[in-house]
């Protein structure tokens, strides 16, 4: 798992270059948002149950066929698996928020997920929507706590949603 700094160093190391102005700007951006990223993750961690419950409730309200007979979250086992997966996306999003790098999402979440879901007959579209709901709920809580610059929250959630949506074509 990499973070923004180790990724930057690796890029410059491979090319044998010293940091240029772009590298310094990247480092400044990383450090200037560090406190807000840490505080945001603290808020998410303190509200995991609420975030998951809110996102799942909204998803099932929007798509009741998921919990209807024959739906992918109909049985207790499938419903629990759905909630487990939603929790998984949220947890790894927090890792990406702290590291300011989405590599962990590829390594630990996205690689092979489409194939797994397809083999189980699970639609990708509700997963993408659940990730969007996690993002929205998290941002609301973070903004309510007084952290106004929260654009960095979007990156991991949007990245997961885009990769999954693109992979389902």
From Swiss-Prot:
Protein residues bound to (2R,3E)-phycocyanobilin: 82
GO biological process: photosynthesis
GO CC terms in record: cyanelle thylakoid membrane; phycobilisome
Protein's UniProt keywords contain Plastid: yes
Gene3D superfamilies assigned to the protein according to its UniProt record, in alphabetical order: Phycocyanins
Keyword NADP included in the entry's annotation: no
Family matches, as CDD domains: APC_beta
Post-translational modification N4-methylasparagine, affected residues: 72
Subcellular location: Plastid, Cyanelle thylakoid membrane
Main location: plastid
A Pfam match: Phycobilisome
PTM annotation, UniProt: Contains one covalently linked phycocyanobilin chromophore.
Keywords noted in UniProt: Antenna complex, Bile pigment, Chromophore, Cyanelle, Electron transport, Membrane, Methylation, Photosynthesis, Phycobilisome, Plastid, Thylakoid, Transport
Entry membrane topology: Peripheral membrane protein
Protein role: Light-harvesting photosynthetic bile pigment-protein from the phycobiliprotein complex. Allophycocyanin has a maximum absorption at approximately 650 nanometers.
Assembly and binders: Heterodimer of an alpha and a beta chain.
Family listed: Belongs to the phycobiliprotein family.
Name of the molecule in the record: Allophycocyanin subunit beta-18
Species of provenance: Cyanophora paradoxa
Lineage of producing organism: Eukaryota, Glaucocystophyceae, Cyanophoraceae, Cyanophora
